[in-house]
From Swiss-Prot:
Changing S239A: Abolishes enzyme activity. Unable to mediate serine depalmitoleoylation of WNT proteins. It comes from the Eukaryota. Keywords: Glycoprotein, Hydrolase, Phosphoprotein, Secreted, Serine esterase, Signal, Wnt signaling pathway. One of its GO terms (cellular component) is extracellular region. The modification Phosphoserine is found at S88. The active site is at S239, D347, H396. This is Palmitoleoyl-protein carboxylesterase NOTUM. Coiled coil: none annotated. GO terms for molecular function: lipase activity; palmitoleyl hydrolase activity; protein-containing complex destabilizing activity. It comes from Mus musculus (Mouse). Residues 23-53 are annotated as: Disordered.
Length: 503
């Protein structure tokens, strides 16, 4: 009983400071806050048992009242949450549990039922649906090879019964400060079609490609599990899942409207799925997924999968050119739903399909110039993206990594930028174009080479496993200090010092 009382006191404190969703109090700077009414008496045990009455709202906190001392306040909240955690741990199950779709006609590649992992949060009206990534296959030969080596990405037969959420799917406030209490849904990738397909397995088709239909069926099923009362649905994804967000976010919103739930705010979070249809560093034949140029692979894939793209984007291109909509900078301007784009400026998957390999032999000058140009090109495509987070790092995927809170752009972390974006909506479907003071959400690094941001994830030598600082990493790649210092108009010693400090 003592643990429950402490939990109620904590919730009362948070409610007074931040307010729950939909009941935020705004005032001009300097204006005295209204005095809070006296607290109601603590409810009896019977009134707080699960399922009784209306659920308590979740707490995406409004920090307007504590803007001057945010770090101290967050430290206190985290300390309270950690101290109370043992009191409630026995009642909480942090794992997401597997649910195979009841509609067994919506399947993985091999015809086994698709599904999702769910962790419900009865007090929250926010839902986070995450689309897993994992490349794709685009013809019978490389799909057969994929089935032999990566069957988990084509079949549900060996999926575990539970998963533990990490990063933005974590239920730990210290790892996931603003979404920890949301309803979490992890949708495994088993369609190999960048979440675009709509074709079942048949006598003619050895494999089903139903990625887009899987998303729709999961949403339909979740309506009966509490999604019908949602205020916000955030469709998130990494890599192929990030591209899947761009392809499906409007379709999810349209489905909810058709089913009678137009008030649910649908938003997107696309991580590491914003690819460029640029020329490869070295042209190669389109034989397998890794070596095939992005445009060639998607051209072939969209036919093989019977892939679907957003209707408004499709109208921008003539018949047979729908593949263009798989590239973020082309589909983004056509989307109705707001989308937050997270993209490393030097994405490892992009460099792989561009035939730039950064391991083994030192990088040649032509490769180095190609890499720098890639960063400039990608930065340019994000210029008009209202909400973005793009660190100058060599990496791939971030939002479900446990270190996702550590990376910063211009002094702001990704969770903080997402929270600022959340706050910009207030109670509307559209975000304010002007961020609140001290709360930015368009953050793109301006430094020109991989890992010039000191908060980038750790680099390790692939042979020794030893950590490398930025200077060591660039030297390992064959970085010519003299030449680059000359290009930048500075002394080589000064350049090395800047690199060692991560500037």
């Amino acid at each position: 009983m003592g643990g429950e009382v402490r939990v109620l006191l904590l919730l009362g404190l948070l409610h007074w400071v931040g307010g729950s969703e939909g009941r935020k109090t705004w005032r001009r700077r300097g204006q005295q806050p209204p005095q809070p009414p006296p607290p109601p008496p603590l409810p009896q045990r019977a009134e707080v048992e699960p399922g009784a009455g209306q659920p308590v709202e979740s707490f995406p906190l409004d920090f307007t009242a504590v803007e001057g001392n945010m770090d101290s306040f967050m430290a206190q909240v985290k300390s309270l949450a950690q101290s109370l955690y043992p009191c409630s741990a026995q009642q909480l199950n942090e794992d997401l549990r597997l649910h195979l779709l009841l509609n067994t006609s919506v399947t993985c590649n091999d015809g086994s039922p698709a599904g999702y992992y769910l962790k419900e949060s009865k007090g929250s009206r926010r839902w986070l649906l995450f689309l897993e990534g994992g490349w794709y296959c685009f013809n019978r030969e490389n799909c057969d090879s994929r089935y032999s080596t990566m069957r988990r990405l084509m079949s549900s037969k060996d999926w575990p019964h539970t998963r533990t959420g990490t990063g933005i799917l974590s239920s730990q406030p210290e790892e996931n400060p603003h979404w920890w209490n949301a309803n979490m849904v992890f949708i495994p990738y088993c369609s190999s079609d960048v979440w675009s397909g709509a074709s079942p397995k048949s006598d003619k088709n050895e494999y089903a490609f139903m990625g887009s239909l899987i998303i729709q069926e999961v949403v339909r099923e979740l309506l009966g599990k509490g999604l019908s009362g949602a205020k916000v649905l955030l469709l998130a994804g990494s890599s192929a899942g990030g591209t899947g967000v761009l392809l499906n976010v409007d379709r999810v919103a349209e489905l909810l409207e058709e089913l009678g739930y137009p008030s649910i705010q649908v938003r997107g979070l696309a991580d590491s799925g914003w690819f460029l249809d640029n020329k490869q560093y070295r042209r190669s034949d389109c034989i397998d997924t890794i070596n095939c140029a992005p445009t060639d692979a998607i051209r072939r894939g969209i036919r093989y999968w019977s892939g679907m793209v957003p209707e408004r984007c499709q109208r921008q291109f003539k018949e047979g050119e729908e593949w263009n909509c798989f590239f973020g900078y082309k589909v983004y301007p056509t989307l109705r739903c707001p989308v937050f784009v997270v993209q490393w400026l030097f994405d490892e998957a992009q460099l792989t399909v561009d035939n730039v390999h950064l391991t083994g032999q030192p990088v040649q000058e032509g490769q180095w110039l190609y890499i720098q140009n890639l960063g400039r090109e990608l930065r340019g495509t994000l210029k008009d993206v209202q909400a973005s987070f793009a660190p100058a790092c060599l990496s791939h995927e971030i939002i479900i990594r446990s270190y996702w809170t550590d990376v910063q752009v211009k002094g702001t972390s990704l969770p903080r930028a997402l929270h600022c974006w959340d706050r910009s909506f207030h109670d509307s479907h559209k975000a304010s174009k002007t961020p609140m003071k001290g709360c930015p959400f368009h953050l793109v690094d301006s430094c020109p080479w991989p890992h010039c941001n000191p908060s980038c994830p750790t680099i390790r030598d692939q042979f020794t496993g030893q950590e490398m600082n930025v200077a060591q990493f660039l030297m390992h790649m064959g970085f010519d200090v003299q030449t680059v210092a000359q290009q930048q108009g500075m002394e080589p010693s000064k350049l090395l010092g800047m690199l060692s400090n991560g500037n």
